[in-house]
Amino acid sequence: MRILLNTLYVTTPEAYLSKDGLNVVISVKGDEVFRIPIHNIEQIVTFGYMGASPGLMKLCADSGVALTFLSPHGRYVGRLQGPTRGNVLLRKAQYKYAEDVDYSLHLSKLFIAAKIQNYRNILRRFVRDNGENSDVVLAAEELQKCKNRTFKATSVDSIRGIEGDAASTYFGVFAQLMLNQRDTFVFTGRNRRPPKDAVNAMLSFVYTLICNDMAAALETVGLDPYVGFMHTLRPGRASLALDMMEELRAYLGDRLVLSLINRKQITIKDFLQQGDEGVVMTDTGKKIILSAWQNRKKEQIVHPYLNEKVSIGLLPYIQSMLLARYIRRDIDDYPVFLIK
C-alpha cells in the first residue's frame, strides 16, 4: 500500500477493501494489514480481482473518493465515481487544451525533449559502465543537439521530425549496447508492422505493454487516453497514451530488452519467422518478457519530482496524475520523468 498525490495504491492482488466507520480497511486473507481515514485520500486504485465491499463503495461515492479497479497486471477494469463533476471538468479542460496550438506545442516539446534526454542517459550510462565507445559518445552528442532543436521548434510537425532524427541516431548505435548474443540478435535499425527481426519484435511488444499501462493510468485519473496533444486523433488510437509513454520508452522498454539479451534470459530460439507477419515471439518468449516486465515493475526507485520511493510500475499513474494536475492548473508545469 502506498499513498502518492493523495491517492491510495493497493498493489497486493489478494487485497480486499472494506470499511470500518469512516476508515478504509485493507485485508489480505482475512487479516487487516492497513487502514486509513477516508477523508485523507482523494482516490483509491486497486490492482487485483478480490474487489471491495458494497459498504466501502457507498462510502467512497458519498465522500467523493474515486475507486478504480485494475487487473493485477494494470489493465483498466472499471471505475466507481460518486456524483461529482471533477472528471467532467478535467476532460473538458483536456479537450479545450488539445485544440490549443500553443498548449499542445509546449507539451509536445516536454514529451520529446524528455524522451531524447532519456535516450542520452542510456547511452551515457553504457559508456560509464563499459568504457569509451566513440560511436555511442558521438550519438549522445548528436542527441543533445536534437534536444536543443526541440525547444526551438515552432510547430508540432517539426517536433515530430526532430523526434525521427533522434530515434534514427539512437537506434543507429542500439546494437552496440548489446554485449552478448549480437551474432544472433541482429539489429540494423528500428522497423515495425511487422517487425523484421527479434529485437524489433521485443521492442514492439514491450512498447505495447507500456501503452496499455499508460492508457489504464490515464483512465484512472479521469483523463481521456484517446485525445492527445502531439499524436493526432485517429479512431481507436490512444493518442494521449502514446504522448505520455514517450518519456518512458527508453527507461521501461529499451532497458528491459537490453537486459534480457545481455543476461541471456531470452535467446533467438524464442522467436519464429512467419512470412508476412515478420518475426514473432513464441509463447515461451512472451512468458519470459511478461515475467521480466512484472518483476521490473516491482523494483523501487526514487521519483525525481516527488522525491519519494515508488515502485516502477506506478510511474504511468504518477505521471498521469501530474499531467491532470497541470491541466487543472494545480501546478505551474508538467514535470517529465527523467532517468539518471
Go through each PLM region and give its residues.
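Phosphate- and other anionic-substrate recognition elements at nucleic-acid/protein interfaces
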Residues: 52-54, 58-63, 67-109, 120
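Active-site helix-to-loop segments that bind/position phosphate- or nucleotide-bearing substrates
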Residues: 1-19, 29, 35, 87-226, ...
